[in-house]
């Protein structure tokens, strides 16, 4: 009698565990689907700073990795400039660094990467050494961030060879960076601009 009760309880317990496991799997699938639906499909542009299509302000700044860096104005080598604003205390910025390095290496004939930050120089130098960024221009300038309307990080601005802002926005993944280059190619400034044009066309 007791063994029958024990067996029934044991079976019910396992049935409950299996049901919970199936429920958890189902929840993970739903979260994944929701993430795909709600995930941004392009870099989110913030208001403020030089607008897309406008000539970016010209800066000539010393680089923490050596030399002077000219940001803005007509490019002397015909390349675009991908200006990446970051901070040593920004974990997403750290995640984005290898992505940006990889992408700009692939397109180094047409694009150069310039890193920009502000704040404590010692902390920036530690990040440069830790993340192996000595091959890239790295500038410290609060005015540069203000000129481009940077309010949140990580943020990127793509300047065309003509010195005009081709695209800009918050970036959290590779797709966001690719959307900046796609915006430059198509002339559509941002995902917001794309949606606005689609609404006008409908």
Language-model features: locations:
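Long, leucine- and charge-enriched amphipathic alpha-helices
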Residues: 1-49
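Thiol-/selenol-based redox modules, centered on thioredoxin-like
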Residues: 162-202
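Thiol-based oxidoreductase modules, predominantly thioredoxin-like and allied folds used
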Residues: 109-125, 133-142
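A short acidic/small-residue loop/turn micro-motif
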Residues: 76-77, 155, 172-175
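N-terminal "domain-start" segment that seeds a small globular fold
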Residues: 39-73
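Short active-site neighborhood of thiol/selenol oxidoreductases, capturing the structured segment around
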Residues: 69-100, 112, 116, 177
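Short, internal strand/loop/helix patches
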Residues: 127-162
């Amino acid at each position: 009698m007791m063994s029958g009760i024990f067996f029934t309880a044991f079976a019910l317990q396992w049935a409950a565990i299996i049901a919970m496991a199936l429920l958890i799997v189902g929840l993970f699938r739903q979260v994944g689907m929701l993430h795909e639906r709600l995930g941004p499909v392009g870099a989110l542009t913030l208001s403020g700073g030089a607008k897309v299509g406008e000539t970016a302000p010209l800066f000539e700044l010393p680089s923490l990795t050596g030399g002077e860096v000219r940001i803005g104005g007509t490019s002397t080598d015909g390349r675009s400039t991908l200006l990446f604003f970051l901070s040593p205390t920004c974990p997403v910025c750290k995640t984005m660094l290898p992505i940006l390095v990889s992408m700009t290496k692939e397109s180094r004939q047409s694009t150069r990467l310039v890193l920009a930050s502000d704040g404590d120089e010692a902390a920036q130098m530690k990040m440069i050494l830790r993340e192996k960024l000595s091959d890239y221009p790295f500038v410290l300038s609060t005015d540069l961030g203000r000129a481009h309307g940077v309010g949140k990080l990580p943020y990127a601005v793509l300047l065309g060879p003509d010195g005009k802002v081709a695209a800009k926005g918050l970036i959290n993944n590779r797709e966001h960076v690719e959307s900046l280059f796609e915006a430059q190619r198509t002339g559509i400034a941002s995902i917001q601009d794309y949606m606005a044009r689609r609404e006008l066309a409908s």
